[in-house]
């Protein structure tokens, strides 16, 4: 969470500019991320640092895909795949009759907020879209799982939740 987002931006900048010093620093940040096993800490403005968080998973997938683009090292792709798997428990892979927007919708975090309510079971579309973006990145390089299908499902869920007419 706290590490993946900044690392992603540094890796992308290093790849686009060709700056070797920035690339070395960004890749060092990726080595430091290897100690983490649970996606968490990406939404500290509202939620406790320790709670599982799909935004952290999405940022980690994207960061490792960017590291793979920069270096071609298979280990980065393996890490991207790992973080993609950690995000799947946040995605509703089923639906309940009468709740048409449930299927492929995404829960942001598995705990509470610093404020007055729980986020448990409540979808937050934009967090899911960050994760879906990461899955699309991964699908370019990895066909071990239908990552693109999951990403498209999340996108379709987001589209179903938009009002096309009438009051919102």
Predicted regions and their residues:
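Glycan-recognition and catalytic cores of secretory/periplasmic carbohydrate-active enzymes
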Residues: 1-168
